[in-house]
A protein has these predicted regions:
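Secondary-structure end/capping motifs
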Residues: 228-307
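Short, glycine-/small- and polar/acidic-enriched structural segments
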Residues: 31-160, 165-169, 173-177, 184-188, ...
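N-terminal export signals
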Residues: 10-30
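Conserved C-terminal helix/tail region of periplasmic/extracytoplasmic solute-binding proteins
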Residues: 298-326
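Short, solvent-exposed loop/beta-turn-alpha elements that line the ligand-binding surface or hinge
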Residues: 57, 61, 210-212, 281-290
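Secretory targeting signals
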Residues: 1-6
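Structured segments of extracytoplasmic/periplasmic soluble domains
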Residues: 56, 62, 80, 84, ...
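Pocket-lining segment of extracytoplasmic ligand-binding domains
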Residues: 94, 172-261
């Protein structure tokens, strides 16, 4: 299976561990465990969380090194997981259920969100399109087939009874192609939505956070092999990731959180504030996954045409409960 390489990959050993390692024999330093983490696109909350955990040296506190890969969509990230090029990825929970039917043995191990906070179907501000039904036979941007943007595009078609052409462009291609007129609309996620709204370059046709019924919309995912062979590394990885999230959500860290989000996403502070207040603070603090949430996620997937799915019970494990690193 061919893996499309990410535009950015960093092997990061957090500073506290690095400093401590200077006093250790070279052979001991060479044995540090590396965990390969994949996220679906750059300007997206799992990237913010993972980068924050790295910058706060939380992986080092757990005794591991994090190698972060930013892919060009959820489908590419899942392909990497299937090929053994990633240990842990963030993706839509239903991707696990679909993958199981294709022989990709993996599980959702920790939930991230119960809604598409900050996700919208948008058009340019000066677009003549005022209603979703006016997108009939038009071009609508998504990151990749099978991604969260694809699921929401298909949901919009089913819910509003309209058909349009879904155009996969990767996370970095959505905004430029919308603004250039190559797209009539696009499914977009925060903080890109907030930036475009504040800049008055786009307006919303659908607020998916309000329109779509609540269900498990995101999860950290690991292969069965990684779960079985390296459970403590997986536990440590989740501890660090949720430590990063809790750091961002803590009101005492608000100024630093806004600064981190602005730096990581390369956005102005006012847009970083919108991302923090309207999205990050709403994310799951404990990584819980309940069967009812997973069932609803699969119902959502079936609604948009994903029919060959493993059961909810087969698609997740509750064996790992994040203990946020501080």
């Amino acid at each position: 299976m061919t893996i499309l390489t990410s535009s950015r990959r960093r092997a990061l050993s957090a500073g506290a561990a690095s400093v401590a390692a200077l006093a250790l024999p070279r052979i001991a330093r060479a044995q540090a465990q590396v965990v390969r983490i994949g996220v679906p696109t750059k300007t997206y909350y799992p990237t913010i969380i993972a980068e924050t955990a790295i910058r706060q040296k939380l992986f080092a506190k757990e005794g591991i090194q994090a190698e972060l890969t930013i892919y060009r969509g959820g489908a590419e990230g899942y392909e990497a997981l299937a090929a053994g090029a990633a240990d842990v990825i963030m993706n839509s929970p239903s991707s696990v259920s679909a993958g199981l039917k294709k022989g990709v043995m993996a599980k959702n191990v920790a939930g991230t969100a119960l809604g598409y906070y900050g996700w919208h179907l948008v058009v340019k501000t000066n677009s003549p399109i005022k209603d979703v039904k006016e997108l009939a036979d038009k071009k609508v941007g998504i990151t990749s087939a099978g991604s969260g943007t694809d699921i929401l595009a298909l949901w919009a078609q089913a819910d509003r009874k309209v058909h349009f052409t879904r155009v996969p462009l990767g996370g970095g291609g959505l905004v430029p192609n919308l603004l250039s007129g190559n797209l009539d609309a696009t499914v977009l996620y925060s903080p890109l939505t907030y930036k475009m709204f504040i800049d008055k370059t786009a307006r919303s046709l659908i607020d998916f956070g309000e329109a779509v019924p609540p269900h498990l919309t995101g999860a950290w995912i690991a292969t069965d092999r990684f779960i079985k062979e390296q459970p403590q590394v997986l536990q440590s990885t989740l501890n660090a990731l949720y430590g990063g999230l809790i750091f961002l959500q803590n009101p005492a860290h608000r100024a630093e959180a806004v600064k981190l989000i602005a730096e990581i996403d390369e956005i102005p502070p006012n847009i970083a504030e919108a991302e923090l207040d309207s999205n990050i603070v709403k994310l799951s603090k404990d990584g819980a996954i309940e069967n009812e949430w997973m069932v609803r996620a699969l119902d959502m997937a079936r609604l948009i045409g994903m029919t060959d799915l493993a059961s909810a019970e087969e698609s997740y494990t509750t064996s790992f409960k994040p203990v946020p690193t501080v």
